[in-house]
Amino acid sequence: MATTNSFTILIFMILATTSSTFATLGEMVTVLSIDGGGIKGIIPATILEFLEGQLQEVDNNTDARLADYFDVIGGTSTGGLLTAMITTPNETNRPFAAAKDIVPFYFEHGPKIFQSSGSIFGPKYDGKYLMQVLQEKLGETRVHQALTEVAISSFDIKTNKPVIFTKSNLAKSPELDAKMYDICYSTAAAPTFFPPHYFATNTSNGDKYEFNLVDGAVATVDDPALLSISVATKLAQVDPKFASIKSLNYKQMLLLSLGTGTTSEFDKTYTAEETAKWGTARWMLVIQKMTSAASSYMTDYYLSTAFQALDSQNNYLRVQENALTGTTTELDDASEANMQLLVQVGEDLLKKSVSKDNPETYEEALKRFAKLLSDRKKLRANKASY
């Protein structure tokens, strides 16, 4: 179903683009999307640290933060946590976490978040420490206070519907103005890993509105890029600063999508003959990795095709490691050794080519992207001053 919905969104965006003209850089909408993947969030965190450093260098401003440059930041699961960390304001109304603070956060708190509950029944982890640290870091901040538009997904197991937390939806659905720590726990509450999360807010007329939520990947798979694009499309329709954009399309968008790594080989390959007699229990051991890798590949395929078809391929950058091995493939191995390996994966990824057809390294591509983000921010600021 997620693949069908993704394809529908893709077709809609292509059709909307056919009658449009090229956008100037100052009119472009900028989108950052961060995949889910548990402790593997260290990989995109390493990439974000590099990008924020480049933005600071280009603009000669050590206080520059990612939220200053992106109109929409979307994330699922651990990507939702990263989204909250770089968009939640501190007491001076700046992001409470710089990108360089995220990897140390994983090292400090990861081992306690992924500490086994010791029970053979129920979820693998009780989630108590995760909630504790989220409340400590995010405080009472709610969605409307985010420093830029956010798109954090979850899934309500009582209504069987996805729930998308965004600022632009609040006028219509004020009950979505939840506390950020409730949202972050919910998007990370992967079935079998953490308990589902219940909390309540109020509707516009004061009625109680209840949520029963699990991991956002249930609703949007691990790659939330298409979700983030959808939110950007709506934002362009309602935000006055995008008044010059009559119909948002790929020519008017800069999209950076960060993965948490996958593997083309898994831990083992299988044949049809070998798996013919497998039952539910045996498939459950491997299906999550298979579906996660496949859905991530298909989303990237859709987006690459759309941007290339409209001669806007430089507007989209997917940063993904496709050759994870061993413990780095695990969502919950928060050992010191494995976390160090994940940092190394992120650092090594910067030196790799974007694709077989594009010899540009990710490091070079991100430097180019940083320059585009900086130039676009300056153009918009100049336009606003008139």
UniProtKB/Swiss-Prot annotation:
Subcellular location: Vacuole
Gene Ontology biological process terms, A to Z: defense response; lipid catabolic process
Modification note: N-glycosylated.
Top class in the EC scheme: hydrolase
Any one GO cellular component localisation term in the record: vacuole
Keyword Membrane (UniProt): no
Keywords: Glycoprotein, Hydrolase, Lipid degradation, Lipid metabolism, Plant defense, Signal, Storage protein, Vacuole
Residue intervals of the PNPLA domain: 32-229
Motif extent (GXGXXG): 36-41
Statement: the UniProt record of this protein carries the keyword Glycoprotein: yes
Annotated EC: 3.1.1.-
Sequence motif: DGA/G, positions: 215-217
Signal peptide from the UniProt entry: 1-23
Any one GO MF annotation of this record: phospholipase activity
Glycosylation site list: N60, N90, N202
Domain notes: The nitrogen atoms of the two glycine residues in the GGXR motif define the oxyanion hole, and stabilize the oxyanion that forms during the nucleophilic attack by the catalytic serine during substrate cleavage.
Additional record remark: Patatin have a dual role as a somatic storage protein and as an enzyme involved in host resistance. This tuber protein represents approximately 40% of the total protein in mature tubers.
The protein's name: Patatin-T5
Lineage summary: Eukaryota, Viridiplantae, Streptophyta, Embryophyta, Tracheophyta
